[in-house]
């Protein structure tokens, strides 16, 4: 149950009530139970100032350093309960956030401090910098308590964005201060690592053609409001957003053995040591003209996608839980995929989409389960338009799998 009350042009009140019957929903956090208030906020907006007290949803850049969001279908509400102030001055925009993060029906023990500053040089060019701090006291109960404990983890981001008439460029560099790693749900007293992220997205688009290239390197880039929630399956307490940079499909067989990003450090097995990911995605689109050799009588749309993501390369030590990483070298392959998508109108009433996917998925390394899966997927999707308001769609899908 959600209620929004707009008092006037400047004041807005919002609240949301959630209720769950006994027994956890599939893939929902078991902390979501009974009846509770999940959102409560008051917002004031004037010409240059935007103030919020209560539940805060926001994102810095593309979310690599900070994102507080809600997705009801997945049972996710990672809002910050606190204070948010935004204001503009000439070409500068400032956004500040402080508070505790919502975790199920409670709030985090870690305190969150964040600021984002955007400077717009030109209409098409701007620079941004962000800071996110998580302050959580660590209570080591054993006698090997470290002497150099810093309860605050700091993340700093620098971003450059350019959007032209035919060319665009977005780049981001993030540094993360040293932080203790959680293993098996317990915070390690001897395993603390720094982290970083490097991101580049660039592309070109014109009439009938488009190119897009994305590169990303992640090293120990997960950040949680509570350290003991590290790498939990429900995304409870996560402060940033790191999706897989691979092509998304509408077809059921194409959504088997899909890749999930690997930003975490893991020493669960001597053969499965990980410290992050490095990889890229390239996409090419072209509109094949009518009456051309490839376009035929009615023309066609061709899309080619290539993606490849690997473990970070370097020297790992399982006994010491340490590593010395190479910056740009690629380690073991997590996931690779090449796909071709052809959309063809045969007439005004009938069209087809032809999809071919060649995929490799290292299930053993990504999920710590058995198998290195090689797949080939073929899809033929047909649409027949009966009239302006009615159509019939039928598709054929086939999956060739090995080692799954």
Residue ranges and their predicted role:
Residues 70-72, 78-83, 124-125, 189, ...:
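Short, surface-exposed, polar/charged, turn-prone segments marking secondary-structure boundaries
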